[in-house]
């Protein structure tokens, strides 16, 4: 990794979370920071048809909600490669509408369960404002692949949750309104995608029906390509498809059996997925390494036990295997008694799968977001480490001013955010330093206030005041 040369400054923005061999990992936030989740399909499959699901209490005091969810519907057949993608972009540019159109178009081919807009945009406080606050996960299939699709929020207040979804993506669909062109959050989401290591992007120019002049659409396309290139995405080579998600969705609602060639707007949706199939490569999964899953969410099921959901970062897990529960509290051992994905039973979960794991003998109070489940003895909790950190410039969305030893930002590691103190700083010549300027690359020693499961080579983000100010990789564990 080029960390010494000044020319590589923007390269190191790719540093949040995970080992160096895996560019994408689980999500870098703990639930205490935001409590406006909705139920994902990952854990609901462990339940009997009328089971009421209760969420673990959070440190914030929001009204408790209960959910009624369906039981598992059969077994998950792994016939196609699995890819995690998602929609990102500015508020009201049509991300959730496009997600709904995608599921309905592919359902018409028999490759997905159709989801209406209001099923994806489900929480009451979201629908009331027409703004998505959380990330919602849906599944669908093309002829060649099985996709888990995260619908990311576009509202500035909820950038934190956008990263929660983005960190799981193997690729993204950037939605830009052809009528408005790139907006502030379009740029912000491209920066965030770069920071959390989303490797590939396909663009959907939405609201084509609202653009009278074809030349205006071409100008927007040029602007989007330039914007992508400015953040080191291959703007000139990025596939761009224009269409209208709303008109496609309306056509599909009127006739769910629409096939290719029946409707020009629905054909644009099929064309978009063709580009995603062709342009976003199937990632190399780390199935040969020891199992690790960062816990994103925890649910308790009466009579069954506790379910932890998250994305398998590496390795494989089967029913009956034992795992360590590591980080934030004392390490403990438990047995996996069930593995399911999208309301279907799995024999074995592989790296890259979004799964729910049923755990034996674990109370919902024993486990929280930010812990990791791992093969026994393969990872331990630590509070002090040295790291190489790149501090973002103002133009990259970072700080405007320097910081000093004693600085106490939030450190985002996998699914947890923990306050840490920068105890010492060394410059790139290994000289003791007291001040760090935006754009600097430094070595620092960090002390966390609680132990977190971390290891050499793991990446993390540093955030303060709602923005990412730095990105780093752990060089060595101190204690």
Curated annotation (Swiss-Prot):
Any one Gene Ontology cellular component term annotated for this protein: mitochondrion
Primary localization: plastid
Ranges of compositional bias, category Polar residues: 33-43
Keyword Transit peptide carried by entry: yes
Annotated ranges, domain tr-type G: 80-284
A family per Pfam: GTP_EFTU_D3
Renumbered residue ranges of the record's region G4: 206-209
Region named G3: 151-154
Annotated region (G5), positions in chain: 244-246
Function as written in the Swiss-Prot or TrEMBL entry: This protein promotes the GTP-dependent binding of aminoacyl-tRNA to the A-site of ribosomes during protein biosynthesis.
Protein name: Elongation factor Tu, chloroplastic
Species the sequence originates in: Glycine max
Gene that encodes it: TUFA
């Amino acid at each position: 990794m080029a960390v010494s040369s000044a020319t590589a400054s923007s390269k190191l923005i790719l540093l949040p979370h995970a080992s160096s061999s895996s560019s994408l990992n689980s999500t870098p936030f703990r639930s205490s920071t935001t409590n406006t989740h909705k139920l994902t399909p990952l854990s609901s499959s462990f339940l009997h048809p009328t089971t009421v699901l209760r969420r673990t209490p959070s440190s914030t005091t929001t009204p408790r909600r209960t959910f009624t969810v369906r039981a598992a519907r059969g077994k998950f057949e792994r016939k196609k490669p699995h890819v995690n993608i998602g929609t990102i972009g500015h508020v009201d540019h049509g991300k959730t509408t496009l997600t709904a159109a995608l599921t309905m178009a592919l359902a018409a081919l028999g490759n997905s369960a159709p989801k209406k807009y209001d099923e994806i945009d489900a929480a009451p406080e979201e629908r009331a404002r027409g703004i998505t606050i959380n990330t919602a996960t849906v599944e669908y299939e093309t002829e060649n692949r099985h996709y888990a699709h995260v619908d990311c929020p576009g509202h500035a207040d909820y950038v934190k949750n956008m990263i929660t979804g983005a960190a799981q993506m193997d690729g993204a669909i950037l939605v830009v309104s052809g009528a408005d062109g790139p907006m502030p959050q379009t740029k912000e989401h491209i920066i965030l995608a770069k920071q959390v290591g989303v490797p590939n992007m396909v663009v959907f120019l939405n609201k084509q029906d609202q653009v009278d002049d074809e030349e205006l659409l071409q100008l927007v396309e040029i602007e989007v390509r330039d914007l992508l290139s400015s953040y080191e995405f291959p703007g000139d080579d990025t596939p761009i498809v224009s269409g209208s998600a709303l008109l496609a969705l309306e056509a599909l609602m009127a006739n769910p059996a629409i096939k290719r060639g029946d409707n020009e707007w629905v054909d644009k949706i099929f064309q978009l997925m063709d580009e995603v199939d062709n342009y976003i490569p199937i990632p190399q999964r780390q199935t040969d390494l020891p199992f690790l899953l960062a816990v994103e969410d925890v649910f308790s099921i009466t009579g069954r036990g506790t379910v932890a959901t998250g994305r398998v970062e590496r390795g494989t897990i089967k029913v009956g295997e034992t795992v360590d529960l590591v980080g934030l509290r004392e390490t403990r051992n438990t047995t996996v008694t069930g593995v399911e994905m999208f309301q279907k039973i799995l024999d074995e979960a592989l790296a890259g799968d979004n799964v729910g794991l049923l755990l034996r003998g674990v109370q919902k109070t024993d486990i929280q977001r930010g812990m990791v489940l791992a093969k026994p003895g393969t990872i331990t909790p630590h509070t002090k480490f040295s790291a190489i950190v790149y501090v973002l410039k103002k133009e990259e969305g970072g700080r405007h001013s320097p910081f000093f030893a004693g600085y106490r930002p939030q450190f985002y590691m996998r699914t947890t955010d923990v306050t840490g103190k920068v105890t010492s700083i060394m410059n790139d010549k290994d000289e003791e330093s007291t001040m760090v300027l935006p754009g600097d690359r430094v070595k620092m020693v960090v002390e966390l206030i609680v132990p977190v499961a971390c290891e050499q080579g793991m990446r993390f983000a540093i955030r303060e005041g709602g923005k990412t100010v730095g990105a780093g990789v752990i060089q060595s564990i101190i204690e």
